[in-house]
């Protein structure tokens, strides 16, 4: 008998559950939890990538870091080691680079430096990611509202994170659908 191929064009409940599970319990290390001692380039890249493991397209390479240093987005390493402040900046960059230009990322950094410390800015970023990600991934039914009096930096941060996390969600959905499609030829072959 002839068996037709089934191609998934929408997500079934199991796929939705797997995508939602990506967001369950997600958290970023706070500024005080980032290594206080400098890290070499490979260690820096490994640490940043470990924070976003499981999210396709959210990754950093050594050449990207070198490019960000060359363009002045982050400062030069001291004795080839990257500081806590640079790690925090790279964690922000790796998430936002898919939705903002480097020029706009630099502008946001300048705005934040004018109003708060690197630790405060980074911890606000972490809080906002952890607020938005579960909601967008369907693991939470609510999201904290922005204060109506929130400054421009907070509004721009929220907008950046909502856009970036929506892109992460879409990438996870499409990966799940492709994985499902890849299973069908083997399953159908077993039925013959």
Positions of the model-derived regions?
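Basic helix-turn-helix/winged-helix DNA-binding cores
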Residues: 3-113
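Intrinsically disordered, low-complexity, charge-dense segments enriched in Lys/Arg
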Residues: 111, 115-192
